[in-house]
């Protein structure tokens, strides 16, 4: 015959929940198998835990006070754990018809014997996302950035259990460690039994009496570390980089998620990227054109010196190889588009130029205009 639960904890029926919890903690620390090496310590610890799980739950305590141990004995009749789909002749409802299994599992979430994913399995944490802004030049040349990043690590105090001590981890008092509860749903077919995740333990089957003082039951702590992020040369706007293990914390010993960084490249005032080429509109004075002068062409890698062809006009292009986007697969080019401009002149300078030009007939224009006659 089982011993009275109140007697096991050394309490009376009028004991408050605080008194029940205090009595359990005291006895659990005394008889925990990791601490007490006596032969009957483990059995005594299980007995104490069972008593606490019943008396700490208001519904179960009320049932125990009214019916005693018979309230939780499936063979005692009354309100035991009988399957509502089983009748006196042994008919087991829809479970005999395999064709209905998947249909009703999808529709109602599964019957009492349906399997569910193990909530205690290791689960990888979710990825976190952030945007990092870089300059156009940094996107071409690449760069290393040192950033302080938050990282979740297993709590060293509780070793990831979330509890103040091992004795604070008990079987869930609501689902008795099953991780599930039976829910009865009324449908057009009648009452249907459905297994749902326990709302108290979220399907884990365990609950914590007193949480870890450091992580507050979260099983992990948050630290900040300076991490070097390598921006590869040639990266494009919208591309992503991955920083492993800097995402959200995993569950049940699962690995952290990753930090996904989306690259946002700030536009340059003069350089424009087209695939792996860089386009530059270069203003050139008419003086430099006439005199076929040398001018500097800016590139992301420094300045290039070119000699102006005296025959160029606005819109003409010059290709400079290997001065575009350079990746391990391809070396882009710089495309220079000339824009000829006339500098500001004084009245005297304009008169001198007019005198010079009057001596030279504009044969190109004369030929062009005759095409319309």
Swiss-Prot record:
Binding site for Zn(2+) 2: 172, 175, 198, 201
Key words, A-Z: Chaperone, Cytoplasm, DNA replication, Metal-binding, Repeat, Stress response, Zinc, Zinc-finger
Subcellular location(s) of the protein: Cytoplasm
J domain location: 4-68
One of the GO biological process terms: chaperone cofactor-dependent protein refolding
HAMAP family named among the record's database cross-references: DnaJ
Family to which the UniProt record says this protein belongs: Belongs to the DnaJ family.
Annotated function: Participates actively in the response to hyperosmotic and heat shock by preventing the aggregation of stress-denatured proteins and by disaggregating proteins, also in an autonomous, DnaK-independent fashion. Unfolded proteins bind initially to DnaJ; upon interaction with the DnaJ-bound protein, DnaK hydrolyzes its bound ATP, resulting in the formation of a stable complex. GrpE releases ADP from DnaK; ATP binding to DnaK triggers the release of the substrate protein, thus completing the reaction cycle.
Record-given protein name: Chaperone protein DnaJ
Organism classification: Bacteria, Bacillati, Mycoplasmatota, Mycoplasmoidales, Metamycoplasmataceae
């Amino acid at each position: 015959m089982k011993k009275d639960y109140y007697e096991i904890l050394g309490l009376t029926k009028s004991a408050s929940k605080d008194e029940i919890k205090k009595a359990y903690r005291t006895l659990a620390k005394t008889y925990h198998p990791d601490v007490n090496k006596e032969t009957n310590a483990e059995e005594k610890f299980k007995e104490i835990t069972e008593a606490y799980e019943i008396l700490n739950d208001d519904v179960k305590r009320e049932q125990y006070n009214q019916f005693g141990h018979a309230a939780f004995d499936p063979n005692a009749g009354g309100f035991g754990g009988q399957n509502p789909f089983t009748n006196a002749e042994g008919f087991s409802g829809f479970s005999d018809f395999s064709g209905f299994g998947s249909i009703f599992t999808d529709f109602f979430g599964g019957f009492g014997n349906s399997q569910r994913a193990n909530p205690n399995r290791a689960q990888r944490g979710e990825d976190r996302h952030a945007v990092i802004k870089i300059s156009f030049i940094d996107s071409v040349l690449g760069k290393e950035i040192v950033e302080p990043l938050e990282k979740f690590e297993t709590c060293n105090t509780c070793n990831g259990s979330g509890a103040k001590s091992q004795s604070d981890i008990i079987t869930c008092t609501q689902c008795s460690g099953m991780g599930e509860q039976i829910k009865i749903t009324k449908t057009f077919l009648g009452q249907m039994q459905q297994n749902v995740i326990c709302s108290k333990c979220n399907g884990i089957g365990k609950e914590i009496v007193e949480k870890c003082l450091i992580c507050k039951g979260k099983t992990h702590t948050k630290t900040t570390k300076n991490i070097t992020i390598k921006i590869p040369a040639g990266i494009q706007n919208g591309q992503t980089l991955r920083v492993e293990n800097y995402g959200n914390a995993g569950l049940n010993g699962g690995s952290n998620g990753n930090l996904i960084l989306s690259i946002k490249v700030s536009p340059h005032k003069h350089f424009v990227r087209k695939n792996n080429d860089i386009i530059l509109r270069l203003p050139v004075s008419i003086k430099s054109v006439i005199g076929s002068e040398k001018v500097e062409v800016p590139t992301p890698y420094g300045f290039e010196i070119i000699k102006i062809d005296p025959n160029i006009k606005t819109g003409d292009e010059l290709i400079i190889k290997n001065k575009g986007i350079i990746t391990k697969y391809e070396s882009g080019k710089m495309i220079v588009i000339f824009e000829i401009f006339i500098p500001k002149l004084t009245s005297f300078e304009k008169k001198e130029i007019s005198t010079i030009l009057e001596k030279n007939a504009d044969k190109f224009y004369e030929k062009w205009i005759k095409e319309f006659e």
